[in-house]
């Protein structure tokens, strides 16, 4: 018989830099999860993606064991890295803060494809393009 899930915790943590300090400690501690073991496991799985924010979905079972699934980095983080900017525009319709090429857009869309509700790369590109527009990033050919 399958173990019963008691909690589903969603966190967005820097790759390879999870520590027992907040937000990890309090989120996992209240469910009785071994925080140090989770941090060690998460850091080991994300060392190759240093510098990115990696969302994680943690399923906690009634015997206090857990499993976790790593998601793809947020499109906004990938777009900011591609455009070499720190943050998006405060007025995206008026002020452009950077630009990316169509090939960079396609690369980001292919990275995000597993987490999006589409299977076509063209649809994924439109989704990521909308995020870019809302950040004040223009797409050039």
Curated annotation (Swiss-Prot):
Coiled coil: none
Cellular component GO terms, alphabetical: chloroplast; mitochondrial large ribosomal subunit
PROSITE patterns with a match to the protein in the record: RIBOSOMAL_L11
One Gene Ontology MF term: structural constituent of ribosome
Keywords attached to this entry: Chloroplast, Plastid, Ribonucleoprotein, Ribosomal protein, RNA-binding, rRNA-binding
Gene Ontology biological process terms from the UniProt entry: translation
Localization, UniProt: Plastid, Chloroplast
Subunit record text: Part of the ribosomal stalk of the 50S ribosomal subunit. Interacts with L10 and the large rRNA to form the base of the stalk. L10 forms an elongated spine to which L12 dimers bind in a sequential fashion forming a multimeric L10(L12)X complex.
Recorded family membership: Belongs to the universal ribosomal protein uL11 family.
Task performed by this protein: Forms part of the ribosomal stalk which helps the ribosome interact with GTP-bound translation factors.
HAMAP family per the UniProt record, alphabetical: Ribosomal_uL11
Protein name: Large ribosomal subunit protein uL11c
Organism: Trieres chinensis
């Amino acid at each position: 018989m399958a173990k019963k899930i008691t909690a589903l915790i969603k966190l967005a943590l820097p790759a390879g830099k999870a520590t027992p300090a907040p937000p990890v400690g309090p989120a996992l501690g209240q469910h009785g999860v071994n925080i140090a073991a989770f941090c060690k496991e998460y850091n080991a799985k994300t060392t190759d993606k240093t510098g990115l924010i990696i969302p994680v979905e943690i399923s906690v079972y009634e015997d206090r064991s857990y499993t976790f699934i790593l998601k793809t980095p947020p499109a906004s983080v990938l777009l900011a890295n591609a455009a070499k900017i720190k943050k998006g525009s405060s007025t995206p319709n008026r002020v452009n803060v950077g630009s990316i090429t169509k090939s960079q857009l396609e690369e980001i869309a292919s990275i995000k494809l597993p987490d999006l509700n589409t299977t076509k790369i063209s649809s994924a590109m439109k989704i990521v393009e909308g995020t870019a527009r809302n950040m004040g990033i223009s797409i050039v050919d």
